[in-house]
Amino acid sequence: MSDAMKNPAGTLGARLDALPLGTWHKTLLFVCFLGVMIENYSQITLPLAMPVIIGQWHLKPFMIGVLISASSLGLVVGALVFGILTDIIGRKRVFILTTVVYSVFAALSAFAADFTQLYVLRVAAGLGLGGFVPVGMAFVSEFSPARYRGRFTAIFSIGNGVVYVLAVLASMFLVPASPEGWRWVLGLGALGLLLVPVIAAALPESVRWLVSRGEIDRAAAIVDQLERRILGAPTMERAAAIAEARASAPSPAGGRSGLAGTRALFGKDLWKHTILAMIVWFVASYTFYGFILWMPSFLTQQMGYELTKGYWFTLVAALVGTGTPALVVGYASDRIGRRRTMSLCMAAYAVFGLVFYWLGGYSILFLYWFSSGMASMTYVYTPELFPNRLRGTGIGFASSVGRFASFIAPMAIGLIVAAGGLFGVLAVNAVLLAGGIAAMRLLGAETKGAGI
């Protein structure tokens, strides 16, 4: 069987997969990398500023969790709505729209006068952040050649770690500098507006999405343009390419996208993939955000570190967990497969959680490393579980479950800490991670090297 016939996007998808890596691929990855950095900045900075806000607004532990979870509530809705929308109006438009929504409300949150205002603005900013995840993952996976997709998507996820380091640095210098320093930290989220003209100029619409919508002429023109830029000339004449693409591409009538498409996620062909993606996102999000976002408070309140020392320790952990986990798991997933790599990350995260409780100190670095590797694998694996016409909807649906987990995790952990301390938090994490490993074994399909 030819590559074109095996590729769900037909000959145009096969031509994309056949392209050697070029400057254009790196530009695409860099723009999406900036997007994930900018749109995750707000998710990270509030917990870092929280020790000061607690003192100024006299917040109780449960209210701390509520405020930390605010953007996650917006993430749940944003992932669902914008995930569906990206399959209806396209990846590029939603990329721009989510960036604007996030940046505007992130800027406004810096001017919040009280708990209620900050909560509402954080929820609104979360709408944009939740919407970016489906479109960003779809963009990178749909333009990455199959043989490099694991590494490319994992590198895209490094933006989460890089921005964590930058957010910690900004918080270290700005938050203690003045009583209003935390406002400057939150307000820096407005820099996302600078990315909008870059997206408009640098990124084309997804070829695979266009093919799934039957817009073969536009898709063929983009592939010709990319081949001309990377190879020097198109590999096929336009008329012949369009004719062959029409013959090999799936019919747009073969499945619906948008609201009607959500039912297809639980049809006989996709239900296992959908349930698995939901479980993976819930486990990864709860255990990652539930622990990592509480790390500054654990270090300062549970372990007695002073504020500056707690920031430094958080910074070291973030540096260790930035870059190398995504690079290693991305390479491993292209070598030994997605399922095995994800399962290994989950198992190691559970083990080192208990090691951290017993030994403390720098064992937290291993904990952060494997949690970051697990988070990166959700970005690699999820887009490959869904067909082109439903990829945004599928990612949005699964990530909304993850965002719900990240919404309840800080509040749940606040209650668990009060009842069982740090050990209780890490024990619950270990149970959830064991469930994730079981789901990978029972429901997981290996997607390494598959055409999408």
Question: Model segments located where?
Answer:
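Transmembrane-helix signature of 12-pass secondary carriers
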Residues: 1-452
